[in-house]
Amino acid sequence: MINEQLQKKIDQSIRLLQSVQKRYDGEIELAYSGGKDSDVILQLAKEAGIRYRAIYKNTTIDPPGTIAHVKEMGVEILRPKENFFQLIAKKGFPSRFSRFCCEALKEYKVLDKNVIGVRKAESRARKERYNEPTECRYFGAKKEENHVEQIFPILEWTDEDVRDFILDRGLKLAPLYYDTGGANRRYPKTRLYVLPAGIKTQAPYRISEASTHSEGLPACRTEVLRYAS
């Protein structure tokens, strides 16, 4: 399941995390969203042996089952002073030019170092936006207390890399990945959806791990089922 190219990426990701820990004595924040990439970086942090603090910033509008999964993974939950609906009642709906909801609910500093599961393969915008495995940014005004170094250990990972790593490590994902896929279609829980988007063009494949009692497939057989264009 883990080919040579992916193993090199895994090794590089682990070395990156360890290199950050070598030059920083404190805990490293692990930005955990409850998504598949978060589960991957959580596993990598464990394998790297770094001192981390996995944190889920509750936006109050995440998919059903997310909080339960976060708790099951032993991740710390930070709750906002005001939820999403209280914010829009006061300020109206957010836009690309007015992102007050992100600032209030998830884009704020907790620790000096912040590991995020962002990947270039997720979108063209991210491919153009992120060039280095680490970057510095400010949450709020450009003051020292707002400065954070962000680390992207799986920046160069493809969707297939994530899929193969999840299956190889036997990672359990949030319910959303097992319950939905494609255009609001529902499938048996034996299926694992790597991209749970509601539009077919955003979910080019899904992984099926089905028993002999499900559609006649051999036990533990894994196959990639590509959507028709």
Predicted regions and their residues:
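ATP-dependent adenylation/nucleotidyltransferase module used to activate substrates
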Residues: 1-168, 222
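ATP/NTP-dependent adenylation/nucleotidyl-transfer catalytic domains that generate, transfer
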Residues: 168-229
